[in-house]
Amino acid sequence: IVMIDNCYCEFVATQEPLEVGADIIVGSLIKNLGGGIASNGAYVAGKKELVELVAERLTSPGQGKEVGPSGGANKMFLQGIYMAPNAVASSLKVAVLTSLAMEKLGFNVSPKWNSERADIVQTLIFNDRDKMIKYCQGIQQGSAIDSFALPIPTDMPGYDDEIIMASG
């Protein structure tokens, strides 16, 4: 069985993993496929028998995929899916521009601006904790949402090192 965690990859390549041989894929609706507006949720797609096995584990035994989102969540899921292609395209443009600009400023980046991409993740290697913190704080200060917030590194469950995040 080939299972793919497809988070951050939806709508990036011309083919999705199921089209090139994966048996089952999973992903989060709060990332690419949710268009930035779905507040929670996930998806499972693939071979029918595998999806049914997963559905039995993710919901109530015996009910499987017959039970699903409730409480008005479907509206946000569908709006997110509608907006996702545009959100992913914008993310890719920003990643390419950031890669080019940061490389020209002397930073190591991965992938390079002109590399083929399989997801929207852009790695910037600072080799200096303070520069990384200042970069994240600058991104946050220039953001349309929560520009007043000051990101700082802190411990986060699931990570061995301190994590700092900026968004907006």
Where are these regions (language model features)?
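General structural feature for long, well-ordered alpha-helical segments within catalytic domains
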Residues: 13, 21, 50, 54, ...
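Conserved C-terminal alpha-helix-loop-beta "cap" of PLP-dependent enzymes
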Residues: 103-168
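Conserved PLP-enzyme active-site core in the AAT-like
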Residues: 1-89, 93, 102, 106-110
